[in-house]
């Protein structure tokens, strides 16, 4: 049983980190993938889903991402599989958009961005995306002593027990697990 007011104040939050990466390939005919800056509207402002991008086509650290936002604006050549390198030099290379967009339903933040080269001399772009999640029904919690449990009920503070000073607990755990598991350290810690 957890106190809803404690959850509102930030109790039990967790950080979920997700790594996304893409490779900017170089093709046999001399073409290569590239990064493009954000497309703009008639007023010169970037389109809404491209607002997190910087001038190099990659979102910087600390940028906020909402579902559908683009964080790497990658473009690939349309004729990458064409083997005639001579015709590529004479004609203009056309590109099609292949952006990486944020797909999670919960907002996130770019935590880190890393640009490096692979062994095969291709550019690798990695983004580490951080989400802050609030506890909900069914989430599992554990103490340092191995006592684990699942949130079965989130109760408003008015319905929680309190002492003479009006102090309410943040969490109520079932005490029937202590005799069989013999985790005395948890009893001392509480």
Over which residues does each language-model region extend?
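Conduit-forming functional cores of very large proteins
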Residues: 1-190
């Amino acid at each position: 049983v957890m106190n809803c007011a404690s959850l509102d104040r930030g109790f039990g939050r967790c950080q979920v980190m997700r790594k996304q990466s893409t490779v900017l390939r170089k093709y046999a005919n001399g073409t290569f993938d590239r990064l493009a800056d954000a497309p703009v509207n008639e007023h010169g402002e970037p389109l809404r889903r491209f607002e997190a991008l910087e001038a190099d086509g990659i979102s910087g650290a600390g940028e906020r991402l909402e579902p559908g936002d683009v964080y790497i604006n990658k473009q690939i050549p349309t004729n990458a599989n064409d083997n005639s390198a001579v015709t590529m030099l004479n004609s203009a290379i056309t590109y099609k958009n292949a952006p990486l967009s944020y797909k999670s339903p919960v907002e996130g933040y770019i935590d880190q961005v890393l640009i490096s080269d692979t062994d095969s001399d291709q550019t690798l772009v990695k983004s580490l995306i951080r989400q802050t999640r609030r506890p909900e029904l069914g989430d599992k919690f554990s103490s340092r002593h191995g006592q684990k449990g699942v949130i079965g009920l989130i109760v408003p503070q008015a319905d929680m027990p309190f002492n003479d000073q009006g102090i309410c607990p943040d969490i109520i755990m079932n005490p029937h697990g202590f005799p069989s598991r013999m985790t005395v350290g948890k009893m001392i810690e509480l």
